[in-house]
Amino acid sequence: PLSTYAVSKVAQETLAFQYHRSYGLRTVVTRAFNHEGPRRGHVMVTSNFARQVAEAEAGLRPPVIEVGDLSSVRDWTDVRDVVKAYWLALERGTPGEVYNIGSGVGRSVREMLDLLLGLTSLDIEVRVDPARLRPSDVKLLVADCSKFHAATGWQPEIAFEQTMRDLLDYWRQRV
C-alpha cells in the first residue's frame, strides 16, 4: 500500500476475514472505487473541480481551475449506483468474500475535467498548482467487477456524464 489510507483498508479487510473465519460473523467486504455525485465533499477531485467551475460561473473567482496531476486514471461510479451495489452485496454476497465495485471504465482526471469544462459556457484556464500534486499517487485504478456482477447481477446504470452534470448543478445551487 502506498498510503496510510490504503494500509487501513487492508487492515479492515483482514479483520473482517478473521472475524468471519474465527467467529462466523457474516462479513462481506466491498472495495468501492471512486464514487461520485451530488453532495460529494469538496476535497475530492471531482467535487473540487465542479465547485471551482460553479464559483467561476457565479463570478466568485477568476475563470481559472487550480489542478494537480491530471494524468492519473480512475474508475468513477455514481454514488447512487454504489449504494445499490452495497445493498446487493448484503442480500446476495457470499460471506467471507471480497467484491470490487466500480464501473470498470478508466478515465483520466483530465478527461473528467474536460467533461466539466464542456458543461459551462465560460472559457476557463487550467493551472497546475504544485501544492495539489500528491507525493505518492497511484497512476491507474480501474475495477474488475466481474466477480460482483456474477454474484449479484449489478452493473452501474447512471452514465458518468450525468453524474458530472448533477455534481456541477449541485455546486451551482450552493455557491
Region annotations inferred by a language model:
Residues L60-I65, A89-I101, I124-V126, V175:
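Core catalytic loop region at the nicotinamide-binding pocket of NAD(P)H-dependent oxidoreductases
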Residues V64-D69, V98-Y99, R107-D114, S121-L140, ...:
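C-terminal "lid/loop" region of Rossmann-like NAD(P)-dependent oxidoreductases
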Residues L2-Y5, R74:
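Catalytic tyrosine of NAD(P)H-dependent dehydrogenase/reductases that use a Tyr as the general acid/base
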Residues F160-V175:
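Amphipathic terminal alpha-helices
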Residues T4, H42, T46, V79, ...:
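Amphipathic alpha-helical segment in the mid-to-C-terminal domain
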Residues S8-A11:
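Active-site helix of classical SDR
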Residues T14-D75, V79-L90, G104-V109, L113-T120:
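NAD(P)-dependent short-chain dehydrogenase/reductase
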